[in-house]
A protein has these predicted regions:
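Short boundary motifs at domain starts and secondary-structure transition points
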Residues: 31-35
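Extended boundary segments
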Residues: 1-30, 146-150
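Acidic/glycine-rich C-terminal interaction modules and beta/coil loop segments
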Residues: 36-150
């Protein structure tokens, strides 16, 4: 059956074959940066917990001005640790929002330390955090991967 427009002509879409969906893990949602923009920093990716977005050995590009939590977005978060000279530990996380079943206006944030899609059977998380507390702990949003120009 040929699709037709309202004028009775064959639809342009009928000339194009349907393309089946094919998962392509090598494609990413993050931009590749050959140079580091002002107001950004890099952070080494220690493992494949956030694959396919980030891979072990790469450097995540972190926007230091953007630290408001957002559902499903990757961030660099800081935790206090007095055993370390600087007093802080840094880690990559994906923020997850949960709403209270009793009061949907009440929300809390959790920092997941891996993506379920990355193959981890169990996802460790920290929280709950209020929006304000999460914003204080988040160093910045991961906006890309640093690939130095050669």
């Amino acid at each position: 059956m040929t699709r037709r427009t309202s004028a009775g002509r064959p639809s342009p879409a009928s000339h194009f074959p349907a393309i089946p969906f094919e998962h392509q893990p090598e494609l990413r949602a993050l931009m590749m940066f050959p140079t580091l923009p002002p107001g950004h920093m890099t952070f080494p990716v220690p493992d494949d917990a956030f694959y396919p977005h980030l891979r072990r050995g790469e450097f995540a590009v972190v926007d230091l001005a953007d630290h408001q939590p957002a559902e499903g977005e990757l961030f660099l978060i800081t935790y206090r640790d007095q055993r370390i000279e600087s007093g802080h530990v840094y880690a990559l996380c994906a923020m997850h929002l949960k709403r209270s079943r009793v009061d949907p206006a009440r929300t809390s944030w959790y920092a997941r330390h891996s993506l379920p899609e990355a193959g981890a059977g169990v996802t460790l998380s920290e929280g709950p955090f209020t929006t304000e507390h999460a914003a204080e702990k988040l160093v910045g949003r991961v906006v890309g991967v640093w690939v130095p120009a050669r």
